Amino acid sequence: MPSNQDYIVRDIGLADFGRKEIAIAETEMPGLMAVRAEYAASQPLKGAKIAGSLHMTIQTAVLIETLKALGADIRWVSCNIYSTQDHAAAAIAAAGIPVFAVKGETLTEYWDYTARLFDWHDGGMPNMILDDGGDATMFVHAGLRAERGDTAFLDAPGSEEEEIFFALIKRMLKEKPKGWFAGLAESIKGVSEETTTGVHRLYILAKEGKLLFPAINVNDSVTKSKFDNLYGCRESLVDGIRRGTDVMMAGKVAMVAGFGDVGKGSAASLRNAGCRVMVSEVDPICALQAAMEGYEVTTMEDAAPRADIFVTATGNKDVITIDHMRSMKDRAIVCNIGHFDNEIQVAGLKNLKWSNIKPQVDEIEFPDGHRIILLSEGRLVNLGNAMGHPSFVMSASFTNQTLAQIELWTNQGKYENQVYTLPKTLDEKVAALHLEKIGVKLTTLRPDQAAYIGVQASGPFKPDHYRY
């Protein structure tokens, strides 16, 4: 990459291809396009310098260009080493927006790119974060913690990725002037977080009194978690497995670990493809839901020798262990649709015999001769082996992200360093923006009907405690 180019992409020559797909995606993302039209004139994000860490896909390109249209300056990385769509990254780079994303990054490259989010091209710093999984947010928090003198954690990494991340922090402490991380933390006015795992990290920081800036939990907007997490996974999971393996799904036995929104969508995806689906759960409520949906609810220990396909969707660690994989059928397919790669004990497989079949598809042989097929090295299968969720469902998620960025940027000082959610009025607005595209005719309450149930005829239609 020439030094005067403020981007890193696989091939800038893919920009035209990416631009064509972005144009198609825009027609499938009515919420984002409506927000772009509504706010472009007022430029509510003027002055915002957004450091974005979110899968660099075609759909994300539409989000980026919406933020740009509303006045923001932007730098972007992908939040997963396998999720970048290279033609999307090329199109964004060609449009003059700094992006550092390549499908198949090394972990070292991933964290180096993340660091470049915070070195603004004019020598300044970002003042907003748009995050997915929390890595950009963790970069700021870990750096400031070490800068303040608490460095012991940097010498005790718990994984290969932490080893690389902590080495980066050590290097930056040497390279940057003293107080650089403190200045960065002070500069950030807020973060909007996309996914369950990242939100979990934020709530822990807030509970411990360590959150450095206000955060909006986009994940728990109804129009995100009940649509992206559920309906998105329902379409994209099987797409990833099929592209990775070309296996016949019908008739296979599949095991889904976790029956939250992502697990529900995953189980439905497999069932719709003709699989006989089992589910494991720790939560009795979710376990009962799965059973009432007709799934066999059992343990991973019971399912390991029986299933042909395994999917983790828990947000927890070590859900599929080495012992589970030892007892699986020959060439059982193992994959993950949770944000991080530690749901499957991939690190424990490193000393076994690996055969790469094709990008993001590996066959791993155990000493007894039986093999498993591991997709995307235990990272997000729907983005590593396929193209992620469809544009329409991502429009709802990214409309929430845009509204969250506007809320935080235009109301500086309003929020404490806690985690907030968007109001139900905005949730309903996001849903309403997507109805016309799919031909929905919404019923309007008469004044007497609205009064009867104690709501405004224009909404909100449900109390905050309502569970959709």
From Swiss-Prot:
Annotated Gene Ontology cellular component terms: cytosol
InterPro entries: Adenosylhomocyst_ase-like_sf (IPR042172), Adenosylhomocysteinase-like (IPR000043), Ado_hCys_hydrolase_NAD-bd (IPR015878), NAD(P)-bd_dom_sf (IPR036291), S-Ado-L-homoCys_hydrolase_CS (IPR020082)
GO molecular function, one term: adenosylhomocysteinase activity
BP-aspect Gene Ontology terms: L-homocysteine biosynthetic process; one-carbon metabolic process; S-adenosylmethionine cycle
Residues that, per the record, bind NAD(+): 195-197, 229, 258-263, 281, 316, 337-339, 382
UniProt keyword terms in alphabetical order: Cytoplasm, Hydrolase, NAD, One-carbon metabolism
A Pfam family recorded for this sequence: AdoHcyase_NAD
Protein origin, superkingdom: Bacteria
Coiled coil spans: none
Record's catalysed reaction(s): S-adenosyl-L-homocysteine + H2O = L-homocysteine + adenosine
Pathway(s) this gene product operates in, as recorded in its UniProt entry: Amino-acid biosynthesis; L-homocysteine biosynthesis; L-homocysteine from S-adenosyl-L-homocysteine: step 1/1
CC cofactor note: Binds 1 NAD(+) per subunit.
EC number, as in UniProt: 3.13.2.1
Subcellular location: Cytoplasm
Residues that bind substrate: 57, 132, 194, 224, 228
Family designation: Belongs to the adenosylhomocysteinase family.
Function, as annotated: May play a key role in the regulation of the intracellular concentration of adenosylhomocysteine.
Protein name, UniProt field: Adenosylhomocysteinase
Organism whose genome encodes this protein: Methylobacterium sp. (strain 4-46)
This protein's encoding gene: ahcY
